[in-house]
Amino acid sequence: MVNGLSEVGIKPDYNLLVIEHTKYVDTLLKLGLKVDVLDPDDTFPDSVFVEDPALTFANGTILLEPGAPSRKGERGLIQPHLTQTFDTVFKLVEGSAEGGDVLRLNKEVLIGLSDRTNELGARALKKLLLELGQESRIVETPRGVLHFKSDCSALDEDTILATPQLANSGIFENYNVILTPENEYSAANSLRVNEKLLVPNGYPRTAELLSRKFDVEIVGITEVAKLDAGLSCMSLRW
């Protein structure tokens, strides 16, 4: 797990990382979710970030194809569990796409093109989403951003938390947008769970801003962030 991909270049502390993951799971349980924790696999150190190799909806799942070479094969780890859970299972067979580039909204699904999700994969994913009754739109992820959702998250049906650079692209012109404060752009990957809004630690101005409208809970992911990951990365939710 600590040997996962990282652009930050700082190796996380294994024991602290395990503690953060355990507290993350405990938080989801406390908020009323049923949580299945899969066994670790050292062959794929990034496999703890289960959001990337699959998408899950109430009526089915889509197995994706990660764009990072070291993550090829991760969907094979998660496939047995998802096929036991869902009657409808689709598999992306063209291009690459990672769940971190997919933002699910009430009216549509946004697919962000990035170094991990290419045009071929996005177009193939768009067709599979339609099979599940989901309209989608392909958009551009800002340069230098790992995943589309590194810079945004859905706070409710009509409200997006986004970095200024992503908000200024016009992608969210039909939504209400809350901008992350300067120097707190990584807080853009927050996570709405039922009535609670989970916000990563270390971003006090963002937490204060969001607490004016939402019930905020701070979740520690200091070590997780060293692996270029955020709150949404460690779970598949439906």
Question: Residue locations for each model-derived region?
Answer:
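The feature marks the mature, well-folded catalytic cores of soluble enzymes
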Residues: 1-238
